[in-house]
């Protein structure tokens, strides 16, 4: 016969190893900051590609906070607060490599932070 304390200890051990998760709306600022962090990192890694895209699409503008974050190699997350969710979505999904590069990286970063999103 298994003791109740053994079962409780096993459940506690499993719970301790499971990562905490949070479900947030896609427009939540924490989700936007993760998305923008991935976006800024991608711009840094592929700067020439972004310059070519912007030259071909001059009406596609970026908030000054994004440009500052790209060229400031310190902690940039506080610079990115206050950018509207609609603007975040427009910038990130507006590039041709969104599906192939940004979307998987954003999904991975959100998952790593224990964040799952739901539609607004």
UniProtKB/Swiss-Prot annotation:
Keywords: Signal. InterPro entries: SRP1_TIP1, Yeast_SRP1/TIP1_CWP. The keyword Disulfide bond does not apply. GO terms for molecular function: structural constituent of cell wall. It comes from the Eukaryota. Pfam families: SRP1_TIP1 (PF00660). Disulfide bonds: none annotated. GO terms for cellular component: fungal-type cell wall; fungal-type vacuole. One of its GO terms (biological process) is fungal-type cell wall organization. The keyword Transmembrane does not apply. Residues 1-20 form the signal peptide. Belongs to the SRP1/TIP1 family. Seripauperin subfamily. This is Seripauperin-1. The gene is PAU1.
């Amino acid at each position: 016969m298994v003791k109740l304390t053994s079962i409780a200890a096993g459940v506690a051990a499993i719970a301790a190893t499971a990562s905490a998760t949070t479900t947030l709306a896609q427009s939540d600022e924490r989700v936007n900051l993760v998305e923008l962090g991935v976006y800024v990192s991608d711009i840094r890694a592929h700067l020439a590609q972004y310059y070519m895209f912007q030259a071909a699409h001059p009406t596609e503008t970026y908030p000054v906070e994004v440009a500052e974050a790209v060229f400031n190699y310190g902690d940039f997350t506080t610079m990115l607060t206050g950018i509207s969710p609609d603007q975040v979505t427009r910038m990130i999904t507006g590039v041709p490599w969104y599906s192939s590069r940004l979307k998987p990286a954003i999904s991975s970063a959100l998952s790593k932070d224990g964040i799952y999103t739901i539609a607004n």
